[in-house]
Every structure is written in structure tokens, then in C-alpha cells.
Amino acid sequence: MDGTAFFFTIFVWFLLISVTGYSIYVGFGPTSSALRDPFEEHED
């Protein structure tokens, strides 16, 4: 396997895992209590 393609693949996987982990942390972590819920703002 070409060295450049291998490191590019590792970089893309690391980027994908990092973004996914950060999204889960923001959505369910300690800072999630500060997020607003637009469904609770409307009373239909």
C-alpha cells in the first residue's frame, strides 16, 4: 500500500471518530443541560 494513501486513510478515520465523539459529548455530556429544546418551547 502506498504510504501517502495509508496516512490519509488514518487521518480521515481519526477525523471522523473525533467529530462523532465530540458530537456525542455535546449532545449527552455535562454541557447538554444548557442546550435548548425547541419542542418544549411550543405549546400546541
Swiss-Prot record:
Iron as UniProt keyword: no
Gene: psbN
Gene Ontology biological process terms in this record: photosynthesis
Predominant localisation class: plastid
Name assigned to this protein: Protein PsbN
Superkingdom assignment: Eukaryota
Similarity comment: family membership: Belongs to the PsbN family.
UniProt source species: Bigelowiella natans
Disulfide bonds: none
Cellular location(s): Plastid, Chloroplast thylakoid membrane
